[in-house]
Amino acid sequence: MNLRYLSYLLYIVLMITGVNAYAAETLEPVAKKGQVIVIYRGPCPSGKTKAAMRKIEKIISYERKNSPVSYSSSPGNWEDGQVGAVDLHASQSAMEKAFAWQESDKKWSKMYDDVAKIC
């Protein structure tokens, strides 16, 4: 009985090791060559993170409808209490164009400031 138990245990360990090795070999990079990832993070008191996240989601929705530069953005809520977003831009140039639009768009700037006020 003990030999059978040890055989099963060894089989499970080998299988888990194989699955982990396979997962490591098949993970795809988050960004392709030339793309740029931008992470926005800021501290936010625990009682205010939900309100801040709702506002960040509204900013992302506004960006999708109004930005002249297309990019992907997802809200982020980190375990250490920080909130923000992760953006994926097609290139350095596209990121700079998005930043220029954000700086010049009064509504976007106000929404961004509102998140800072919440936190």
Locations of regions flagged by a protein language model:
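Intrinsic-disorder-linked linear interaction elements in eukaryotic regulatory proteins
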Residues: 1-2, 15-16, 22
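Short S/T/G/P-rich N-terminal loop/turn motif that feeds into the first structured element of a domain
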Residues: 22-110, 116-119
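Bacterial N-terminal signal peptides that target proteins for export
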Residues: 1-9
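Bacterial N-terminal signal peptides
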Residues: 8-17
